Amino acid sequence: MTDGTGALVFVKSLLAEYLSEKYGISVPAEKGVLGRLEEPSPEELEDSFARYAGDVTASRAEATAWHLTGTPETDGYKDLVTLMVPADKLRSCAKDHGVSVTELLCAAMMQAILELQAEKVPNPRHRKPVKVLLPVNLRKLFPSKTLRNFASYITPEIDPRLGACSFQELCALVHHKMGLENNRWTMRAKFAANVASERSPVLRVMPLFIKNIAMKAVFDTVGECKSCLCLSNLGRVELPEVMMPYVRRMDFIIGVQAKAPHNCGVVTWGDTAYINCIRSIREPELEYHFYRVLHRLGLPVKVESNMR
């Protein structure tokens, strides 16, 4: 239905309406808050994938990543570990390594997964690629104002069978992967493959139950199994000044994947970056390794959890 950017606009606008109703304040339509009495514009409802897709498609074939395993939680319970880091120190650390905050966190997560895999799989020849999926907000590359889903992805990866690498080398790998693919030409070719499938005359007349089976098969082949987890960073959240006194904190929590038990959502509110690590298994092994990596980088980290 939408992506992280669209969901944030919805939450901001909903919060503005609540505050207006409860406290009688007037919230201007700015900084991602929509005019609540206005009709949605056609641009907000646009399918920007269909509008900007080109004729050239990129291959969706990728190597399968290593998947973390553990004891499944009962009754659908989800464990959440939130790591809170001073935003200025996180930015400074990223700058020292010549990367963005998102790239630094991606490299740190990859380092944590590499260390965990080394514990679980002692023989390096039996290890699998470590890949972290980074969503890309396509509105920054194309002139779109849609509130529907308009995000693609980039998946930095490293194969531990090729030998050890330093953290700085990991940062460089992530940085150059982002630099190579985070452009409108590469992104257009990526999502053009999906749009071409949607436009297929065969799929248009195919019964829904068959279409669902086919879509699941494709997703299992080129979807979640191709990465260890998703790390999505919404960045710094801004609100109209009149709303600020009523908001203590913001978190960004994404659901776990069907075939991988971990995911990670990041958002910065005020002077703190909130890194929300969610999982559907009991063992907090990845979070422990991730915390250790951040600690080694000299970052002060506070941790809270809902573990039972």
Language-model features, listed with the residues they occupy:
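Non-catalytic, low-complexity flexible loops and terminal extensions
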Residues: T2-S92, G298-R308
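Structural preference for long, well-ordered alpha-helical segments in enzyme cores
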Residues: G6-E17, L90, V101-L114, V174, ...
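Acyl-thioester-dependent acyl-group transfer interface
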Residues: T82, R91, E115-R308
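Histidine-centered acyl-transfer/condensation active-site motif
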Residues: M1-E21, V267-L286
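Hydrophobic/aromatic-lined pockets within catalytic cores
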Residues: T2, L15-Y23, K95, M109-V121, ...
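Short, surface-exposed helix-loop/turn micro-motifs enriched in polar/charged residues
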Residues: T2, V101, P122-H126
